[in-house]
Design a protein with these regions (language model features):
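Hydrophobic beta-strand scaffold residues
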Residues: 68, 157, 178, 237-238, ...
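Rossmann-like adenosine-cofactor binding region
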Residues: 131, 162-243
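Glycine-rich phosphate/diphosphate-binding loop of Rossmann-like nucleotide-binding domains
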Residues: 103-191
Length: 305
């Protein structure tokens, strides 16, 4: 759910998100497609207006008869999925009390954490986070727990958010520091973890980066394909977004559809790091960007059988 300037912008976002979800599930080896929906609103609703909106959306999802399943993402959560579940069975990520597996945000954060460690290992020869500086952009459902995992492992965590109060709260909780949102790109760090809006990596912003690794949960991080090539040319290791942020999708499909145990989920989340290592090795061997290497792997998986 998001405020879009035009219907065309909303449609384009849905198409980009669905393409990324298709690749995400393919690389993760899960037997599902990649349909995505967006809800375009003039402002983010609350209260009864919000409930009515999600009931209308639930009717649409139900009318598709199961060929499309939905879950939470930007500006939505478990409570919204519970509302959808009142009228449609085809929803992932409902609360545990409503028979779901809960929010996909925490497992997404775990997957990003494993991905960051794999990226550190490739870039520096060690996955040790002790003393590493990590800038986490976004203090929401993924950024907040990710900051905690990183700090617990010894990283120095800087948290930025468009809401300074939220950044302060997360930074205080994890023993890090808040970073003004307008200082994201000029702050020297080992890892920049974008965990908020997409399109953050562009031909304008990539030259400003002062990090060795970009690894975060945001969807559609690349504003244009040229940004991936610029990262490659600058020697900045980019963890392809649909690979590193797959933890939430893996969790809801594994737990709710495939009947996984928590142990099986933990193993699957750790494999995100292993997949990234394979992508990095492929990229190095072929002299291509990590984004291109990930796309090749996704196409291989989609063409199997």
């Amino acid at each position: 759910m998001k405020v879009y300037e035009t219907p065309v912008e909303a449609l384009q976002d849905a198409m980009r998100l669905s393409a990324a979800m298709t690749r995400k599930l393919a690389v993760a080896g899960l037997p599902f497609g990649g349909g995505k929906a967006v809800i375009a609103v003039p402002e983010i609703p609350g209260g009864e207006q919000r409930r009515a909106l999600f009931l209308r959306y639930a009717d649409l999802v139900a009318s598709l008869g199961g060929i499309f399943r939905t879950s939470s993402d930007m500006n939505t959560g478990e409570a919204d999925m519970d509302v959808i579940g009142e009228r449609a069975d085809y929803v992932f990520g409902r609360s545990v009390e409503a028979g779901g597996s809960g929010s996909p945000a925490p497992p997404t954060a775990v997957g990003v954490y494993h991905g960051i460690r794999a990226s550190l290992s490739h870039a520096f020869g060690s996955d040790d986070l002790d003393g590493r500086i990590v800038v986490v952009q976004g203090a929401g459902g993924v950024g907040s727990p990710l900051a905690g995992h990183l700090a617990h492992a010894g990283a120095s965590v800087l948290v930025a958010d468009i809401d300074p109060g939220r950044a302060d709260a997360v930074a205080t909780r994890v023993g890090g520091a808040a970073l003004p949102a307008d200082q994201l790109f000029e702050t020297e760090c080992d890892v920049y973890a974008p965990c908020a809006v997409g399109g953050i990596l562009s031909v304008e912003t990539v030259p400003l980066l002062r990090c060795r690794i970009v690894a975060g949960s945001a969807n559609n991080q690349l504003a244009e394909p040229e940004a991936a090539e610029m990262l490659h040319a600058r020697g900045i290791l980019y963890a392809p977004d649909y690979v590193i942020n797959a933890g939430g999708a893996i969790a809801i499909v594994g737990l709710e559809q495939l009947g996984w145990s928590k142990s099986e989920l933990d193993t699957a989340l750790m494999r995100i790091g292993e997949t990234l290592r394979e992508i990095y090795e492929r990229a190095d061997a072929r002299g291509i960007s990590t984004a291109s290497a990930a796309d090749v792997l996704a196409e291989e998986q989609l063409n199997v059988g």
